[in-house]
């Protein structure tokens, strides 16, 4: 069970947090919106991969949908993306509207009816016979009667609109993104909600044996870890820390260990991880790796292709911002990349695999 639980979170859907460290130069290179989109896509991609594993016989077409057997049929049904597939292959029937489209249309119809003074949209079932009762005024007594004894009585308070436009579905393992600065992150680590007592645990302090503590007991260790965590923000050049909360706790421990989809340098090293309390620490991974792992670089290259390419090539050659990579592309490989002869290509490939720097 993850100990990082926010106060407003229901106990049925515990969160597993991941922090993405964005180096300062990447924060300058990409906007926060682009980084956020990158993270959303990568999280969705990982969730989708975990949810439906593709068998060996299943291939995927260009849109990413599954095809069984011998690939797509010669003539597929021409149905627009937002509608359900037709049983007859979309030949004669008009496309069925999705529930969302129907709701949207109803909403528009209601708005149009409201704008015209004193008119209401025509209902299919004819006029309503029963007049609707006025909303009952919520009093203390009625709230006691309606609510169970344990629940807090809300004195006629209007429910707040959801904070996010597309709120993630807890049952399907949706993802929320929060972009926070290091200071906010420090503040958030102090806000610990205790699920048993229902109280907030304060920031960890040293034990009372001396002014600096004994340095051995659990309280002192927690305090030292917290101090080191605060200092690590200065040593790593991060201007942004983006925290990803997955709404559904993963049953297996595949978040903690790099899988086949995540390369070696995916998670940040241990000294850059958030301090562990009772449960798992907040995992942090590198945004550079994330950009390489996910196909979002195509999207980013649309903005400025040469700049992004130059950045990645410079990185690959000098490996300054992504030093945990096992494979270093030598400068010779970059120099001989233009040659088309097969010997040169195989030579470059072998050099890249071995990772040796050879002077021309």
Curated annotation (Swiss-Prot):
It comes from Arabis mosaic virus large satellite RNA. It comes from the Viruses. Residues 97-114 have a biased composition (Basic residues). Belongs to the nepovirus protein P3 family. This is Protein P3. This protein is encoded from a satellite RNA, called RNA3. Residues 46-128, 151-175 are annotated as: Disordered.
